[in-house]
């Protein structure tokens, strides 16, 4: 099989493919194991990095309110909460994901990465935001999550204590942070995204 399918690069490609189909409604995506949240190590074993993308998409509201070049904003009907999804993907990589499955195809991937290894600078402006908000930030990179444990196979989840399992899944999870802010009409943010990086911002009205 194509080695890219199980890698940390697959979420960026899938998101690019989904975003290419524009619409005013978000498809509902359900995680196979809802109790595990963004955990990659579950009682059924180690899940692939694309599972994290599904967990992020599940947080999007059902109505698309803005969409453009590598960004998407959604809102849940009847609520003031807004979710903004940003990503950095170059369509020149499409043929490597859509082509054959030979391992030799990793060579052109490395060459393309050399030519397109640049950060994308994004300025985000969210208006008509007044009041207290909890802002959750999730950052998903192209890192191969299981690589750090390659020399030590992960044990079955039921062999680990609840605390060890919690910490282990924390090391495998996307980078997460939370800010509590009082907004007076707008929110501005400038940031940089590395190739294949995905960022989800969730604005929750308190």
Over which residues does each language-model region extend?
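Carbohydrate-binding surface patches
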Residues: 70-153, 195-202
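An alpha-helical appendage that flanks or caps ligand/catalytic pockets
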Residues: 136, 143-174
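Short, solvent-exposed coil/turn segments
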Residues: 36, 47, 117-119, 182-186
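C-terminal beta-strand-rich structural cap/linker in extracellular carbohydrate-active enzymes
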Residues: 160-206
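Generic secondary-structure transition motif, activating predominantly at the C-termini of alpha-helices
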Residues: 45, 55-62, 130, 141-145, ...
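Aromatic/acidic polysaccharide-binding cleft in carbohydrate-active enzymes
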Residues: 1-105
């Amino acid at each position: 099989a194509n080695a890219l399918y199980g890698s940390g690069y697959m979420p960026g490609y899938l998101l690019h493919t989904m975003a290419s189909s524009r619409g005013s409604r978000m498809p509902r995506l359900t995680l196979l194991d809802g109790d595990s949240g963004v955990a990659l190590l579950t009682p059924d074993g180690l899940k692939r990095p694309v599972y994290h993308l599904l967990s992020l998409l599940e947080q999007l509201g059902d109505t698309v309110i803005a969409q453009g070049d590598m960004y998407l904003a959604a809102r849940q009907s009847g609520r003031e909460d807004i979710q903004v999804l940003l990503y950095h993907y170059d369509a020149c990589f499409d043929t490597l994901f859509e082509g054959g499955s030979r391992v030799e195809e990793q060579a052109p991937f490395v060459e393309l990465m050399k030519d397109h290894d640049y950060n994308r600078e994004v300025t985000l402006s969210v208006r008509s935001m007044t009041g207290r908000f909890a802002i959750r930030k999730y950052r998903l990179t192209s890192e191969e999550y299981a690589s750090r444990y390659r020399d030590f196979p992960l044990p079955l989840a039921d062999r680990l204590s609840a605390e060890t399992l919690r910490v282990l899944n924390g090391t495998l999870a996307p980078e997460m942070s939370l800010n509590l802010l009082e907004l007076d009409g707008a929110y501005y943010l400038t940031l940089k995204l590395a190739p294949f990086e995905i960022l989800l911002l969730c604005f929750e009205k308190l």
